[in-house]
Every structure is written in C-alpha cells, then in structure tokens.
Amino acid sequence: MSNINLATLDISEHPNLPTSSAVLFKAKADKKLSFEKIASHIGRNEVATAAIFYGQAKASAEDIVKLAEVLGIDHGQLEFLLSGFPDRGKSVSFPPKDPLIYRLYEIVQNYGYAYKAVMNEKFGDGIMSAISFSTKVEKETDNDGNDWAVVTWRGKWLPYSRF
C-alpha cells in the first residue's frame, strides 16, 4: 500500500478558480503526481508550480510544454487555458476558511507589526516585495520525531522614495 499524500481539488468548493485548475488537478490526481515531482519536471519551485495550478502564477511557454508532457494533457488545450494573465488574490475568501490558510493569515495578523518593526530596524522605511519574491516549504524532523514545517519568504527590500 502506497503512502503518498497528494493535494487534490474539489472545484465545486472553489468557484473563483480558473477553468484551468480543474483540468490541471484532475490530470495530477490521475497521474498520482506530487507538486514536488511536477516541479522537478518543469524546473520550477514546488510552491510556484502549485500557484500555477491555482491560477495565481503565470505559466511560461516552456512551463506549458513541460506541464502538458508530464500531465498528459493536450498541449493546445493547456496553452489555451493558461494563455491569460492570472487574476491573483480572488481565489480565497477573506478571512480564509481553510484552517491551514487561516493559520498563515493568523501568523501575519499576530506577528505582522513585529515583522514590520524588525524589518524597518534592519532595512529602514520600506516594504518587502511580493513580486521580486521567492518562497519554499521544507520539512524538518526534530530529535523527538516531531515534524516541523519551515516556510521561507524571500522578498527584495524596496525602500520608500522621498519626493
């Protein structure tokens, strides 16, 4: 018996996702592929790959070729579905209802001002970019056998302009 955890999607519970999401997730489930395996095939980070599936990131022409190949989707169909620009941010209700997504929201809610204060002290007046940005998720296991999620955010610092 295989112990594979795969993220799937019930599109009926996510009416704001693009049509491409249903096609991508069905092929992912049919092929029993993790985002890690798909990301490795297309040469992208697994979070960036998942963002394409949710319509939150733009797939390049090369991404589309490789996604069609690994997922067994007709290239022309996938090119049509992924040809537009992402409509970012509309896929999740606010505040989020999913417990894990809500915890991420809660982290920013609870620690946002602390992050801001520390960043301002380290970098000055400005913001961390979410455009010149990368993120990754790693798994750590401590000495007691407890699993820990390590989420890294890396954003370019953008100082406010004086005018």
UniProtKB/Swiss-Prot annotation:
SMART domains: Cyanate_lyase. The lineage of its organism: Eukaryota, Fungi, Dikarya, Ascomycota, Pezizomycotina. Belongs to the cyanase family. It comes from Ajellomyces capsulatus (strain NAm1 / WU24). This is Cyanate hydratase. Catalyzes the reaction of cyanate with bicarbonate to produce ammonia and carbon dioxide. One of its GO terms (molecular function) is cyanate hydratase activity. It catalyses: cyanate + hydrogencarbonate + 3 H(+) = NH4(+) + 2 CO2. Its EC number is 4.2.1.104.
